[in-house]
């Protein structure tokens, strides 16, 4: 199990460095970097399935620790997957807006009688602004949805990790005071997560109200 764990952990660290390279990539290479990162993430998920099987076969005194290490890797790669999806969503919206802006700037109206062209007037510019506002709202909603999905995935992972920590605490014979502190911290983390979700929704609502 250990060689596969070390290999997978190294891949996670490499993806973290590639995410920084993704932010600096130009339009010609950004798709290649995205595909490279996605392929690595899929390979890591495959390794994690194998590691979960191997961790369940570890000796009893090492099994819980092995599962915790696998859960930490799973949490890290889920976070990276969410970050990649958010980046792709922002890039796609930005590229779509650029295409629409170029189309609007190059669009002219031609009369039936001659080749005379009529430049874009204020009404068309106003419609263009409304169109961009609608796409901006879609971008906010899509980004908020991605954030909420990421929080849900992290909550499930943390919930499983908390249960394993409590199991280890019982095995090691930790005091009830220590276990209560662990449960209190998990309870506080839950409210922090809910507060973050409510704050995100409030910001999205205020931005939509401002834009409309």
From Swiss-Prot:
Its main location: Golgi. Involved in transport of proteins from the cis/medial-Golgi to the trans-Golgi network. Residues 60-92 form a coiled coil. GO terms for biological process: intra-Golgi vesicle-mediated transport; protein transport; vesicle-mediated transport. One of its GO terms (molecular function) is SNAP receptor activity. It is a single-pass type IV membrane protein. Belongs to the GOSR2 family. SUPFAM superfamilies: SNARE fusion complex (SSF58038). Part of a unique SNARE complex composed of the Golgi SNAREs GOSR1, STX5 and YKT6. Interacts with BET1. InterPro entries: GOSR2/Membrin/Bos1 (IPR027027). The keyword Transmembrane helix applies. Residues 1-190 are cytoplasmic. Residues 212 are vesicular. This is Golgi SNAP receptor complex member 2. A motif (IxM motif) lies at residues 118-120. The chain crosses the membrane at residues 191-211. It comes from the Eukaryota. It is found in: Golgi apparatus, cis-Golgi network membrane; Golgi apparatus membrane; Endoplasmic reticulum membrane. It comes from Mus musculus (Mouse). GO terms for cellular component: cytosol; endoplasmic reticulum membrane; Golgi membrane; nucleoplasm; SNARE complex.
